[in-house]
Amino acid sequence: MDRLKIFITGLSGLLGKALCYEGGDKFNIYGTYFKKDIKCANVSSYKVDIRDKKSLDDLILSIKPDITIHTAAITDVDFCEQDKETAYEVNVNGTRNVLDSTKKVSGKFIYISSDYVFDGNKGYCNEEDMPNPLNYYGLTKLKGEMLSLEYDRSLVIRTSIYGFNPNGTREGIEGIIKDVKEGLTIQAPFDMYNSIISVNMLSKIIYRLILENAQGIYHIGTKRRISRYEFMEKLFLVFDLPRRNLVQIEFKNYQNKKIARRPQDVSLDTNKLTNDFKVIPTTIEDDLNALYKISSSYFAYFGGEQYVSEDL
């Protein structure tokens, strides 16, 4: 049986890299990056801006992927609030371009959305709850969902992620670890919640859903909601970071430092995922420990700078 062709936008991002790491030996992986190429075996990467409809069209039509996983997006919430035009061009029109090209080859389309489509007033949101984004980033992700769901071969995944980003910006947890090693203090709200999951665990579940031919909307996260502060506590414990460098703050104080409004509780109900596919959510402790165990091999896979393993 021929291996599935999987096309990933945003190869150089947190999730893009994890999808390569977790699927490179099982699928034929192709994809795009915007600025910085990734360095890993078993992946064919191309420098293409998803706003460039013709270049994207030409590439996808030449590859004819079975599955397209659209991870590329501007995820800086405050940037999106300040530069709405660029945010819309990338997060909405870019999604439309990727989707249109995917339709032309009759491929399946997987759209990575966000828990920020919700307003944070309820918590443990399920797939039937009405989205109500508080900021422009969340609005662009919701518009991307709406476009995706017009296609009958689409899967929308709402989630919140963390992970390593070898050779990338300091958006990964290696950035947090390096900041702490340099003596900086991390502030985290104790009353702001989500269901954050590592990109590696999320990637495994995405590949499971591909094989299950899942469609519609699914929420993916860890077993229970967790506050930003509690998550940092557990991260500090697993990676043996000094607790004196972690300070808890109130959500209102966190919000005051931001430009865009943030939802306070966007934890996700994942029962639909469990009921439909018997996927049992992991605990955040198991998730962090699994990430710790692969840290050296993960950075080596991408030829990345050893932010983490040299200090562990």
Q: Locations of the language-model features?
A:
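C-terminal amphipathic/interface module of NAD(P)-dependent oxidoreductases
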Residues: 261-312
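NAD(P)H-binding glycine-rich loop region in Rossmannoid oxidoreductase-like domains
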Residues: 50-90
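NAD(P)-cofactor binding segment of oxidoreductase domains
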Residues: 82-110
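Catalytic helix-loop patch of NAD(P)-dependent Rossmann-fold dehydrogenases
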Residues: 89, 93-97, 117-157, 161-164
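N-terminal Rossmann NAD(P)H-binding glycine-rich loop of SDR-like oxidoreductase domains
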Residues: 3-26
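Rossmann-fold cofactor-recognition segment
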Residues: 42-52
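NAD(P)-dependent short-chain dehydrogenase/reductase
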Residues: 146-194, 199-201, 208
